[in-house]
Design a protein with these regions (language model features):
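Hydrophobic "anchor" residues
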Residues: 106, 163-164, 233-234
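Short, acidic, Ser/Thr-enriched surface-loop or helix-capping motifs
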Residues: 101, 159, 228
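Glycine-rich phosphate-binding loop of actin/hexokinase-like ATP-binding domains
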Residues: 211-268
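ATP-binding/phosphotransfer module of carbohydrate and carboxylate kinases, centering on a glycine-rich
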Residues: 1-64, 68-73, 77-113, 117-144, ...
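Short glycine-aspartate micro-motif
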Residues: 75, 85-89, 146-150, 214-218, ...
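Active-site glycine-centered loops adjacent to acidic/histidine catalytic or metal-binding residues
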Residues: 194, 220, 386
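Glycine-rich phosphate-binding loop and adjoining helix at the ATP-binding site
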Residues: 109, 113-213, 349-360
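Short secondary-structure boundary segments
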Residues: 153, 219-221, 270, 340-341
Length: 423
């Protein structure tokens, strides 16, 4: 039987440093006293930790709090220039790459629009690599200052030694995306599902902030969720929890891109909405066929004058409400956040109807305790969520890394990085 691991003074110091840094990052600017109170650390411990974090360039003094006559206390926040992170949103026809400083302020953006209906893995790697190079050049930061790259993808992400993507709807079956990107960029890469990335961004900064039990919905071409349970992202046995778009809403119904019939995505996904409109109004003038977002916007805008648009959106509201009711009944969240470009577009005009439809299908008690709200971070929130992946890694390690910001790459080993032991 293996012996239990002994907690050392070094482990405790790293844990305390991480706790303090998390609080400053998410809730700063804070005083030292506030850091100690929320992190559960003594004044002496906080004083020593903050001195180290300031000396290491991770945290900065940013002025004094307003005083009511007592001695004003210094305010702390993370140092934006400590390092930089990159977030990537891999869509099915677009790749968005954004570079952020350590406080997650946007510094550069690059968008690639592909000319194929579904992005091949090799093409995706090429677009991501091109985008990374472009944003580093635009922001004029040294590559050595990049703490990491977080990549959000459609499909299931299996976290083995390296992340492997299973995107059944887009033909990505067992794609070793993390290894491919490490080889092409030489940077530390983290990969996660797009809905989970969106959920993390909304929980840190957006409409799910302050919740311990929430469901963040991503509606676009694909449909998925991020489930927050007791303050943690619920992943399941193989990190595939949350594939709400492939729950059955109509037995034997429309064929979904995954190959099954009756999936929710086949009724409320963007492609399904456009196809249903075309079925009811062949050759209708609801936007350009090549511009799916434009087509959806046109359908929403014409709902009062176009009977086909009104019928399509009425069906979407009903199915979406029923699907949200399932989430309410299954997970008992305090909040459901509707996000993704399609979710934002629909809820801007139709959220009251969606709430009403959800209430018609949900159990009374859990529905009486839930808020259904629109996401707050906009259409690029998935890339921001990708950027939170390397940030979370740094914060959880207490920013115990070598050099200025990032760990240093091991010579001759692309993508491998050294880490400095805790002080």
């Amino acid at each position: 039987m293996p012996r239990p691991r002994t907690t050392t003074v070094r482990d405790l110091r790293k844990s305390n440093r991480s706790s303090a840094l998390w609080q400053v990052f998410l809730n700063g600017p804070l005083t030292r006293q506030e850091v100690g109170a929320v992190a559960g650390l003594s004044p002496a411990t906080v004083s020593n930790l903050v001195a180290d974090l300031v000396a290491d360039g991770v945290v900065a003094e940013v002025g004094l709090e307003d005083s009511n006559g007592g001695r004003p206390r210094g305010l702390l926040q993370v140092n934006p220039g400590y390092g930089y992170v990159i977030g990537v949103d891999v869509g099915e026809t677009t790749v968005l790459v954004e570079l952020f400083d350590f406080s997650l302020q946007l510094r550069a953006r690059h968008t690639s629009v592909t000319d194929v209906s579904v992005l091949d893995p090799q093409d995706a790697v090429a677009h991501i690599t091109e985008g990374i190079q472009a944003v580093i050049a635009e922001a004029d930061v040294p590559e050595q200052a990049i703490l990491g790259v977080g990549v959000a993808v459609p499909g299931l992400v299996e976290h083995r030694e390296y992340a492997v993507v299973h995107g059944q709807s887009i033909g990505w079956l067992g794609v070793p995306l993390e290894e491919m990107l490490r080889a092409s960029t030489g940077l530390p890469i983290m990969v996660d599902n797009g809905a989970k990335s969106l959920g993390q961004a909304e929980r840190w900064f957006g409409a799910a902030r302050g919740t311990d039990n929430a469901v963040i919905v991503l509606l676009g071409v694909g449909v998925g969720t991020c489930i927050i349970s007791n303050g943690e992202v619920y992943r399941g046995a193989t990190s595939s929890a949350g594939e709400w778009g492939h729950t059955t809403i109509m037995a034997g119904g429309r064929t979904c891109r995954c190959g099954a019939r009756g999936c929710l995505e086949a009724y409320v996904g963007a492609g399904a909405i456009a196809a249903r409109y075309e079925e009811l109004s062949p050759g209708g003038a609801a936007g350009s066929p090549a511009d799916l977002e434009g087509r959806i916007a046109a359908i929403i805008a014409s709902r009062d004058s176009d009977p086909a648009a009104a019928q399509v959106l009425g069906e979407v509201v009903t199915y979406l409400g029923a699907g949200i009711a399932d989430l309410v009944n299954l997970f008992n969240p305090e909040r459901v956040v509707v996000g993704g470009w399609l979710g934002i577009a629909l809820s801007a005009e139709l959220l009251p109807g969606i709430r009403e439809a959800a209430g018609a299908h949900a159990l009374q008690l859990p529905f009486s305790c839930v808020e259904i709200v629109t996401a707050e971070l906009g259409q690029n929130a998935v890339a921001l969520g990708g950027a939170t992946l390397p940030i979370a890694t740094v914060l959880s390690a207490g920013a115990v890394l070598t050099g200025h910001g990032p760990a240093r790459r091991v010579p001759g080993q692309p993508g491998r990085w050294t880490a400095q032991a805790a002080r």
